[in-house]
Amino acid sequence: MGIPPNSTAFILSGGGARSAYQLGVLKYIFSEMGCVPESPIFVGSSAGAINAYFLSLRAHHGFSKAIIDLCNIWSSLTVDRVFRTDSWSIVKGVGNFVYNFTIGRYVRQRHIESIFNTEPLYELLKNIIVSEYHFLDKNIEAGSVRALGISAMQYGTGRTITFFQASEKSGIQPWTLLRREGRPAKLRLKHVLASAAIPLVFPSVKIENSYYADGSVRATAPLSPAIHLGGSKILGIGLRTIAQQSQPIENYPSMSQVIAMMLNTVFLDSIDFDVRVLERVNELIEKLPKEERGKLRPIDPFLIRPSEDLGLLSLPYKDCVPKTLKFLMKGLGPTDQRGADFLSYILFDKHYINALIEKGFQDAYAQREILHHFFKKSNQRMKDLP
């Protein structure tokens, strides 16, 4: 069974709590539009890896049910179900860093894995995923999912490794480029956790003989794995609004603003840039005579972005943060509009999560005609537009 001529790939990147926005978009596509992708490809990194893995795991139930189940899981989240928020855990995590930076050079340094203890997230995902590994294997072998790719950054080399699982019949081969590699694997919980391991914030994860960090770090070409896995149509879900109303700051930036800027650079910018590059490459390919194109083929991308700043969307829910974390955030800087971006990454609260899902659903609905045309070109089965 080869790759169909119009394989649709879904790119689910990271962004902490913001990644719930993806669910709203997919909920509209799978449930409201009734789009049933034929052997789709899912590529995930960071929190998007969790979403990609779950949808592939539950594909045998149908994507419309799988996305509803995933929305329910996200809606049940609280910050302390992702990482420990008790006073001792927070003080220990931050204190160990302070210790090593100050007196650690004079006495024995402490082994530090991360600021936050993410054991709750591990337990949550283990209870959901581990007992259903066999469903993922069956779904991929049956063709319900053409391929699943989970990206992580390899410490030491700095290479982005995309671990992928696909049927042997698919003909998908490993790939090696300058800073990127595609490596076949039986995808398990460790791959998901590695992809979501934000450096310093969450602990790195060991796979075979190497340690890995968040897959969005140094991911300069996030569309590349989808193309290597056979996607000729790519739907990406961005987390930065087109009309970003950012203004230069007049006062010296707070620590929370600095951290937010770094996170924005890691999570939000790469996919927008890569889509623009792909569109330009497509233009060049289209100008070539067909007999001169060789193996070159145009890739049809579509990127959905939020119509509203997801950072500002978090402000009405800032009091939902646990007291210990709120105390830490105040030490890093303002918790008003100036600190909204940082807040939006860690605000795993059902009220904010539901607001993100609803916003994603509304934005997909607003672009329903474009989406309908995009999927109809792929001969996907779907409901007629109202």
Predicted regions and their residues:
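Patatin-like phospholipase
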Residues: 1-43, 50-386
